[in-house]
Every structure is written in structure tokens, then in C-alpha cells.
Amino acid sequence: MKHKSLLTRVTLPLAVMALAVSMWGWALEGEQRTFVRYVPPSYNGTRPVPLVFEFHGYGSNALVQVFYGNFMSLADRYGFVIVAPNGQGSDRHFNLTGEAGLQDDVAMVGALLEHIEATMCVDQTRVFATGMSDGGAVASVLACRDPDRFAAFGAVAVVVYESGCADTSVPIMAFAGTADPVVPFNGGVVNCCGHPTLPGAPSAVAGWAQHDGCAATPVVDQLSTQVQRRTYAGCTGGGAVVFYVIQGGGHTWPGGLPVPSLGLTTRQINASSTIWSFFAAHPLA
């Protein structure tokens, strides 16, 4: 009976949240695209609220990511709306590299943002992007290509830096595990998804630090046995770069549901609450 009572207390909030999660579709250049939306109970349509875009990993989907990242409890507490687009293709991924036969997903996100802003009461100074794995790449690419409409970015398990980014300094936070079995921490061949080669997370974060005019060497804080924080100080133009290294961590969402096949999920930090605190501190100027 004790265990049953505990289970009820844990699952009831998720059941209530699920009632507020809805799937939507809209036509984009003749193609049907879909997204999941979560609206907190406090939303009344008259007071502008923050908007968090959340992107799923390769082969996953928006609904899974919304529950995996579990920003919903934070949305209830702080009053922001969550929008999670679905990828495309038979393997459900985001097209960031001009793949033939697929829509440009950076353009898709821009169109979806315009749609949400036209149909909801959104604070345009507090629009944010975060994601897991392939979704972390989406958030990173948006930071590079569309920094004037998004205020801050959070990338989990994959963070990338492209050459030729817009000059605008951006606040970006990244998480990566040193024992990631899918995307090597220090770079190399990815163990899925067509096996592309990616630079390591430390290299990508260093690229963002240079882009933002930050100090080349980060301030390192060992927060716990598994969590090291690297903060790049002195950034210019409102930029900020913070990197959480999960020592022994896998291809997982810190503080999220464990996925043993993808390695360690640390319980020593919660990526969602940490990312939201970072977002809340960095609205558009």
C-alpha cells in the first residue's frame, strides 16, 4: 500500500500535465508538419509569456521529448509555453544541412515561431531554444543563424558551432557526458544516424566562447563527483557560455528518466531546471 500511494503521488501530476499537451498540425510549403504544445494553467491569452522551443533527438519525436525533458513542471511554476516540433523523414530528424527532398528545418522553426506569435500572447524578448542530441544541434544552429529572435539556447548531448555565424553574441549553455556511447565527447564518428563525424563538445563550446568574445580559458568548478561546470567569463555583447561536463555521463538528459542503453543519467544536476534558470536570466535586450 505504501508503494501504491507513492506511485499515485508521482504519476498524478504527469497525468494532469498530459491533459494540457496537445498535438497540432499546419501546412508549410505544401507539406504537413506537426508539433506538440504545452500550455500552463496560468496562461490567459492577455499577458505575454515566455516561449520555449524544445527539439527531440534523432529517431525520437516531440511527444517523447516533452515528457523526457519534463519542462512542464517548470512551465507550470514559471508560466511559459512549450512548443516541440517534430522532425521529418522516416527516421524523424531535423534537416540542418540542405538534404535533398526535405524541408529546411531552420526555416520551419522560423515559420512556426511566426505562427505561434500570431496565435498566442508571447513575450518576444523571451523566446528560447533547447534540445536533446539532434535537437541540441538544432538549438546550436539556431544560435548561429537566427540569434535575433531567440534570446538564449540550451544544448544537451550535442552542441555544435558553425563557421560564419551571425555576429550577434548569444547566451548558450551545453551539457555533455564524457562516456557518451553515441556522440564521442572529444569528437569523432557518431554511433548512429548515418555515422557523421562531429567535433567534440569541448571544441564546439570553445568556438562559442571565441564567438562571444569570452576568455579563452574557462573558470572550472567541480560541483559534485559527476558534474563539472566550465564558465567562460568576460563575454561581450550580452553573450554567455556555460558548459556542464558530466563525468562518466552518457547520451542522456541529466536529471531525466534513465536510459541504461545510452549510459549514465546523472542525478547530481537537473538539466531542465538549470537551463530554465539560464534562460530566465537572459532575455533579449
Give the role of each language-model region.
Residues K2-P13:
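Bacterial N-terminal signal peptides that target proteins for export
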Residues A18-L51, R77, R126-G154, V158-V160, ...:
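A domain-start/cap signature at the N-terminus of enzymes
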Residues M23, A27-F128, M132, V138-V141, ...:
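Serine-hydrolase catalytic machinery in alpha/beta-hydrolase-like enzymes
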Residues F67-Y68, F185-N191, G200-Q210, S224-T231:
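Short alpha-helix in the alpha/beta-hydrolase fold that links the catalytic acid
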Residues D167-I172, G237-V241:
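Short, proline-enriched alpha-helix->beta-strand connector loops that line the catalytic pocket
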Residues A174-A176, D180:
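Short beta-strand/loop motif that positions the catalytic acidic residue
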Residues D180-V183, H251-T252:
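Acidic catalytic loop of the alpha/beta-hydrolase fold
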Residues F243-L257:
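Active-site-adjacent mobile loop/cap segments within catalytic or ligand-binding domains
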